Amino acid sequence: MKTIQRLGAVALLAGGIGLASATTVHVRLTGAQEVPPVKTAATGEAVISVMPDHKVSGAVVTHGIKAFMAHIHEAAAGANGPVIIVLRHSAAHTWRVPPGAKLTGAQYRAFLAGDLYLNVHSKRHPAGEIRGQIKP
């Protein structure tokens, strides 16, 4: 229930003034999506919104993981890529896109093509324990 409340709050924030034309994506994060796949019971859900002017907002809520970092990366499913946005730890199990985050033109095109992903890192799996492709 807390997850639904947190994601509901994220959706309300993303649905604020001026976000009517945003592309909003719901993302499920699992270890199976990592490259290479990670065996873990940890999961996550995210709501990410991208405006036509390339501004990004949203958050990830995790379960069953003691995360120390979370990022948005650029790469297609099945590949690893560079960090493009560092998420901020804002509350227990919640990571948010920082205010003012914005994609470049090339990154925006990658977003539209489904070639961005969320990655959450733990001490147990420092390269990433759970991942979810951001597919508009």
Where are these regions (language model features)?
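Bacterial N-terminal signal peptides that target proteins for export
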Residues: 1-11
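Metal-centered catalytic cores of metalloenzymes
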Residues: 2, 20-70, 74-136
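A generic hydrophobic-segment detector
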Residues: 9-13, 135-136
